[in-house]
Amino acid sequence: MQKATHSITPEGFPVIGLTALAALVFAIIDCWFMAVVFLLLCWFSVHFFRDPERVVPSAPGAGVSPADGRIIKVQPMPDPFTGEPRMCVCIFMNVFNVHVNRFPVSGTVQSIAYHPGKYFNASWDKASTDNERCAYDIVDADGLRWSMVQIAGLIARRIVCRVEEGDTLRRGERCGMIRFGSRVDVYLPEEYEPKVTVGETVFAGQTVLAAKKEQPAE
């Protein structure tokens, strides 16, 4: 299991290095237009692959957002592993968001299912079933099952998974990323309810996405 310790995610170093080198080469041969183009690409790459630290909420039993972005759906959807309807929260990431993904809860990865697919706009309904995606079946400390799905989008063409089946991670711990715009869906256990609404902006590892339902007083 790979852990990021830098302000830039490891996947970004090759891209940043190549664009910086290209800018330098074009500057040396006095091709300033291309030098500026690659310098701007280098700046964009640094911005895209940034990996800021986050303050994970200490509230017990809370599930946090696995991604930066905007909530585009909060509704029941078929679970990717069981097919049964479960409350799902969908987060859309544009190219300007931080794209490092984090674990929504402390728990163990029971299984990982990768599905090659198409690259429809990640905000479309059929992206959940037709696009390239990677699904994680997670069991938390209470034995409750969560599902998290990384979905590639129109521009995103590579899903990065940093965990393996059997790995145990803490809530808010880094677990992967999707390059250049994408979406992450979280399927909640029946015992949890969403704490976000459509249109809300969320931050990975920091925004409380769901909490345990209050038990009715006897």
Swiss-Prot record:
Textual note on the cofactor: Binds 1 pyruvoyl group covalently per subunit.
Required co-factors: pyruvate
Cellular compartments per GO CC: plasma membrane
Compartments, as annotated in UniProt: Cell membrane
Disulphides: none
Main location: membrane
Keywords (A to Z) from UniProt: Cell membrane, Decarboxylase, Lipid biosynthesis, Lipid metabolism, Lyase, Membrane, Phospholipid biosynthesis, Phospholipid metabolism, Pyruvate, Zymogen
GO MF: phosphatidylserine decarboxylase activity
Enzyme Commission numbers on file: 4.1.1.65
Domain of life: Bacteria
Major enzyme class: lyase
UniProt pathway: Phospholipid metabolism; phosphatidylethanolamine biosynthesis; phosphatidylethanolamine from CDP-diacylglycerol: step 2/2
Coiled-coil boundaries: none
Active-site residues, as the UniProt record annotates them: S182 (schiff-base intermediate with substrate)
Post-translational modification note: Is synthesized initially as an inactive proenzyme. Formation of the active enzyme involves a self-maturation process in which the active site pyruvoyl group is generated from an internal serine residue via an autocatalytic post-translational modification. Two non-identical subunits are generated from the proenzyme in this reaction, and the pyruvate is formed at the N-terminus of the alpha chain, which is derived from the carboxyl end of the proenzyme.
Known function: Catalyzes the formation of phosphatidylethanolamine (PtdEtn) from phosphatidylserine (PtdSer).
Family: Belongs to the phosphatidylserine decarboxylase family. PSD-A subfamily.
SUBUNIT field: Heterodimer of a large membrane-associated beta subunit and a small pyruvoyl-containing alpha subunit.
PANTHER family found in the cross-reference section: ARCHAETIDYLSERINE DECARBOXYLASE PROENZYME-RELATED
Protein name: Phosphatidylserine decarboxylase proenzyme
Origin species: Oleidesulfovibrio alaskensis (strain ATCC BAA-1058 / DSM 17464 / G20) (Desulfovibrio alaskensis)
